[in-house]
């Protein structure tokens, strides 16, 4: 069996070496010749997998180590009898940690009280749903917009217009869809961007084209009161450098790049592949993860809750280093910048998720206990 896989997928050998030959290739340069003799294709979101790539090949299983499937032609898969799997929720916690770290940076820059702001979460799936749970657990005022879920299930949802009108912070977590009533392509176009409340913080860690990047650049130039945090970009790995310069935080599509998130994605497609073969999985991710580097955090009961929240969030993720690294890469020719974008992702330093953090409170503090619980850290 020949397995062709994106070279940046972690733990390939640990999970897949028992099935056959593994051939690692750069994800952006996958072509028909590369996959023609493959039985299995394992990719990330940088590879578009469609008829043009697969027709005439031996591929019968496609796995993507990502939440989203907008890079997969699922209609063609069905027509061709190709089984497939994504990794829903694999990096959701990492993205939540990214948003929490970004909020701490924004609050520090603006001297804002995070408790006094109204938060809007657009998209309440694996990522957005977890973020909503954390924000509400912290006692913050949260509005949620997700029209497809509002139709399909009961829930306390609001319209996008209400999000724009009422929220001081808007965090985007929608999939990318380009057609139909639920299209999210340029969901935040010039008109909606111009309608943002004064002082709004806009965070996009979903897909780049959910926000019209050219329009956002012009709106940010015209309105210094707005703050933008972008982890995803239209046309990436090519980035609008002028837009990045206007963002308070800019990063190269790494929001979900926690160690657990990346390895969990591989584990999920391994499990799906085992099911495809009709055999039980024999390898567990828990046996492969190293212990957290930060063993424990001790907080005295008298600790200021706001300081404790900031410290716990930043103990697992502080976006300022990624922002600085990314800005240093935005020099030279466009081709050099494209290569640097991919290199930053390929060689991204490992970071851990907050759910692996153990926190001990010395004494009794309901406020601190609530924060630890809301964040999903382990109280000991």
From Swiss-Prot:
Stated family: Belongs to the D-isomer specific 2-hydroxyacid dehydrogenase family. PdxB subfamily.
Q: Looking at the keywords, is Iron present?
A: no
The entry's protein name is Erythronate-4-phosphate dehydrogenase
What's the source species' lineage?
Bacteria, Pseudomonadati, Pseudomonadota, Gammaproteobacteria, Pseudomonadales
Provide the protein's localization. Answer: Cytoplasm
What residues does substrate bind to? 45, 66, 257
* Assembly mode: Homodimer.
List the InterPro entries: D-isomer_2_OHA_DH_cat_dom, D-isomer_DH_CS, D-isomer_DH_NAD-bd, Erythronate-4-P_DHase, Erythronate-4-P_DHase_dimer, NAD(P)-bd_dom_sf, PdxB_dimer_sf
**EC number assigned by the record:** 1.1.1.290
Pathway per the UniProt entry = Cofactor biosynthesis; pyridoxine 5'-phosphate biosynthesis; pyridoxine 5'-phosphate from D-erythrose 4-phosphate: step 2/5
Briefly state the protein's biological role. Answer: Catalyzes the oxidation of erythronate-4-phosphate to 3-hydroxy-2-oxo-4-phosphonooxybutanoate.
Looking at the keywords, is GTP-binding present?
A: no
Query: What GO CC annotations are associated with the protein?
Result: cytosol
Q: Which GO terms describe its molecular function?
A: 4-phosphoerythronate dehydrogenase activity; NAD binding; protein dimerization activity
Which controlled-vocabulary keywords does the entry list? Answer: Cytoplasm, NAD, Oxidoreductase, Pyridoxine biosynthesis
Amino-acid positions noted as binding NAD(+) in the UniProt annotation, renumbered to this chain: 146, 174, 205-207, 231, 256
Under PROSITE patterns, the record lists: D_2_HYDROXYACID_DH_3 (PS00671)
Please write the reaction equations for the catalytic activity of this protein: 4-phospho-D-erythronate + NAD(+) = (R)-3-hydroxy-2-oxo-4-phosphooxybutanoate + NADH + H(+)
- Catalytic residues at 207, 236, 253
Q: What NCBIfam families does the record point to?
A: PRK00257.1
- Annotated GO biological process: 'de novo' pyridoxal 5'-phosphate biosynthetic process; pyridoxine biosynthetic process
Q: Which CDD domains match?
A: ErythrP_dh
Major localization class: cytoplasm
């Amino acid at each position: 069996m020949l397995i062709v896989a994106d070279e940046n997928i972690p733990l390939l050998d640990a999970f897949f070496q028992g099935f056959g030959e593994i051939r690692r290739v750069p994800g952006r340069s996958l072509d028909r010749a590369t996959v023609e003799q493959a039985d299995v294709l394992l990719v990330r979101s940088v590879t578009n997998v469609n008829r043009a790539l697969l027709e005439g090949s031996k591929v019968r299983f496609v796995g993507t180590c990502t939440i989203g499937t907008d890079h997969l032609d699922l209609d063609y898969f069905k027509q061709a009898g190709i089984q497939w799997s994504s990794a829903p929720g694999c990096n959701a916690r990492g993205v939540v940690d990214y948003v929490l770290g970004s909020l701490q940076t924004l609050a520090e820059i603006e001297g804002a009280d995070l408790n006094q702001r109204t938060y809007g979460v657009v998209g309440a799936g694996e990522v957005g749903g977890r973020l909503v749970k954390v924000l509400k657990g912290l006692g913050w005022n949260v509005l949620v917009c997700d029209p497809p879920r509002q139709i399909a299930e009961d829930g306390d949802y609001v319209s996008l217009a209400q999000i724009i009108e009422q929220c001081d912070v808007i965090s985007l977590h929608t999939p990318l869809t380009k057609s139909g009533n639920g299209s999210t392509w340029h969901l935040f176009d010039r008109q909606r961007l111009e309608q943002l409340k004064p002082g709004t913080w806009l965070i996009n860690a979903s897909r780049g084209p959910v926000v019209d990047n050219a329009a956002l650049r012009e709106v940010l130039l015209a309105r210094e009161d707005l703050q933008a945090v972008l982890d995803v970009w239209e046309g990436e790995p090519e980035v609008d450098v002028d837009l990045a310069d206007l963002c308070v935080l800019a990063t190269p599509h790494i929001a979900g790049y926690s160690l657990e998130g990346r390895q969990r994605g591989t584990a999920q497609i391994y499990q799906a592949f085992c099911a495809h073969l009709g055999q039980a999985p024999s390898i567990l991710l828990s046996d492969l993860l190293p212990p957290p580097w930060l063993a424990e955090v001790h907080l005295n009961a008298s600790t200021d809750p706001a300081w404790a929240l900031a410290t716990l969030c930043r103990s697992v993720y502080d976006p300022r280093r990624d922002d600085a690294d990314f800005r240093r890469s935005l020099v030279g020719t466009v081709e050099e910048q494209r290569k640097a974008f991919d290199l930053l992702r390929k060689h991204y330093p490992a970071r851990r998720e907050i759910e692996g953090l153990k926190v001990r409170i010395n004494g009794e503090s309901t406020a601190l206990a609530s924060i630890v619980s809301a964040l999903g850290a382990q109280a000991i």
